């Protein structure tokens, strides 16, 4: 791996017991978690690991391999930098290249894939009027997700459900109901956080093109004036046959025109539903300059490597930018997703962000 970059470790395992893969075999690692922008549906994180297979050890049909019987669908992976976990997941695909330079390409997915494949069986009648945290726990139970790998917070009560949808869809509803987010952490913990969580997240990194103290320099940035992300009308869809709630922020409509969105959010309490609609109509109603994507190289960043490696989805970062005409702009951002490409001579990172909105309301 590159000099002055974090020390990369890839380990395969079963049942929570891991064995480290020798550095000599690792050709490249690509990970992606989260999403590239806010207000998009949950998708599974992925990790693509390419290994030198001249030894034949990573051919799953090689009965003499120490990995024989282990290198199968569902095998666990743990990827770390400086001993800090940056991805955990399960083997989904294995492509063996038997050419002049034999390689094996392994594709891993995180827990969202397991939740997306699991279906909550339809019920004859709607049942389980419960909090968002309890509903999320029910969905995770149906997906056979381990009880010890959960962190679920959400006290808003949801309407009874007839199920008949994927467990991931249920979890998306839970996140919508609490105005928060659901994700699987870099260490494999299924996490539901409510609206209030955004006010307690750490600011992990300062990115700057001006050489500020304790900052990480970036070499690429994509900014957006924010008009693409304006929404000023929101409808809370609580389900068929019940009253739906909508809200509109007229000042924004006057400036940008009507931009509407619908939340699949079966909120039980009508006051909570009305407040959720108000919040959803207001939080993205202003066009604010945002840093959609920040690109940098994780080489030679010293002690800040720990902060970078520990950065989690929904954490906060700051971006300082000096414009061509001499203005210094600071953008406060929330991490929506991350992608990393690690090779023998580089460690490239892209962080995808949205603007931290300052609004809150009781839901």
Whereabouts are the PLM-identified features?
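Acidic, small/polar-enriched beta strand-loop surface segments
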Residues: 1-27, 127-129, 169-344, 351, ...
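Assembly/oligomerization scaffold segments
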Residues: 1-127, 159-179, 184, 210-219, ...
